[in-house]
From Swiss-Prot:
Site (Reactive bond 3): 16-17
PROSITE patterns according to UniProt: KAZAL_1, KAZAL_2
Protein name: Ovomucoid
SMART domains: KAZAL (SM00280)
Subcellular location: Secreted
Species of origin: Caracara plancus
Length: 54
């Protein structure tokens, strides 16, 4: 199972680095920072489906 450590988030600004992750909502997030901010916003209901585009 793919996991991402989101303990250091949310962050106010994410880098433009492109390393896509696919969330459990079938949305592709451009990087770990954007994904983790979305996890925080979802109160932990959003999870990582897999690394790469959805």
């Amino acid at each position: 199972v793919a996991t991402v450590d989101c303990s250091e988030y949310p962050k106010p600004v994410c880098s433009l680095e492109y390393m896509p992750l696919c969330g459990s909502d079938s949305q592709t997030y451009s990087n770990e920072c954007n994904f983790c901010n979305a996890v925080v916003d979802s109160n932990g209901t959003l999870t990582l489906s897999h690394f790469g585009k959805c």
